[in-house]
């Protein structure tokens, strides 16, 4: 006897399972089954496809008029941080630049101070609250970066918190050491601080899967970033890079040359960098909510990357300064509106390709897969990025069990 059958599904979304990320035109290929059925036993998928009455189960969910998809993957977050920066919004409205806000004691260094002052347990409670919000919105796989400690004690504190969260909730969660995220005030120079972070790599390897660096004007150069990435690979890390967010420094080209698993942001990436994606499996993780929040007009050139047969994914970039959202459904809508992605491209970018960007087996519904699913209160898969700003996730299913039920009920 099976444990659960989800039947009469209006649309069952079945992203293609591949060893490598979907590239170029492949991203627009999505198997959408009308009147579908999913059968689950022992937390695994037994069957997923067109409607069938050939299976029995102890529990049945009628998904008439609903969409069922794999649980979503958020491939770029800064989940563990102290404090918040809502007061900076008024400064931005007054026309203050990021550097001016930084000089006033705001910006990333204010988050560094707040994170340093927050105990590990309090940091855990805050991150747990934010993680549960992600789960309620359909996410069951997450990447979590450090980068707000900028010293040994506090970088480790951030990584320990994300590891505790993964253990408590048994999530597909990957942890990224982003020690070179900014340069703290106490550092004698960028170069000296970078060497401090490189020296930490063997120790943080016990808590982190990836090593990341912020390659940008005024932070770390291309040469410094390459040095760090090479040292990280020597220490056993797969590497990522925050690249070309503001200036076209060649961060995307560096990521491809160093065989990074992903290059993230890429708003200012050059045509040369986009062309190099053609022969690379590095995933371009695009973060359109960041561009929106910062009030910028130019978004990452998703269409140019796809035209060059590149692989792209989407993520929230959840952080307190430039993308204060942990709702990936909002990102899906922004990507459709501003990156000009089709509904199929959006869905693949938050499932199978996002999973490739953090090196996990997720984002598909195949026989033998973990039964990590979302039942959406939507008539079709195009409706979710179309009707933006609300939570369409009705039920979130983890390992075959309903762990979130957002069904509305009122007492009048």
Swiss-Prot record:
Binding site for Fe(3+): 76, 78, 242, 317
Single biological process term from Gene Ontology: L-histidine catabolic process to glutamate and formamide
Enzyme class: hydrolase
GO MF annotation: an example: iron ion binding
Residues noted as binding Zn(2+) in the record, renumbered to the chain: 76, 78, 242, 317
Positions that bind N-formimidoyl-L-glutamate: 148, 319, 321
InterPro entries per UniProt: Amidohydro-rel, HutI, Metal-dep_hydrolase_composite, Metal_Hydrolase
Residue positions binding 4-imidazolone-5-propanoate: 85, 148, 181, 245, 322
Gene Ontology cellular-component terms listed: cytoplasm
Keywords from the named record: Cytoplasm, Histidine metabolism, Hydrolase, Iron, Metal-binding, Zinc
Cofactor annotation: Zn(2+); Fe(3+)
Major location (coarse): cytoplasm
E.C. designation(s): 3.5.2.7
Catalysed reaction equations from the record: 4-imidazolone-5-propanoate + H2O = N-formimidoyl-L-glutamate
Cofactor note: Binds 1 zinc or iron ion per subunit.
Subcellular compartments: Cytoplasm
Biological pathway: Amino-acid degradation; L-histidine degradation into L-glutamate; N-formimidoyl-L-glutamate from L-histidine: step 3/3
Tree of life domain: Bacteria
Family classification: Belongs to the metallo-dependent hydrolases superfamily. HutI family.
Protein function: Catalyzes the hydrolytic cleavage of the carbon-nitrogen bond in imidazolone-5-propanoate to yield N-formimidoyl-L-glutamate. It is the third step in the universal histidine degradation pathway.
Protein name, UniProt field: Imidazolonepropionase
Protein's organism: Staphylococcus aureus (strain MRSA252)
Source taxonomy: Bacteria, Bacillati, Bacillota, Bacilli, Bacillales
Gene name linked to the record: hutI
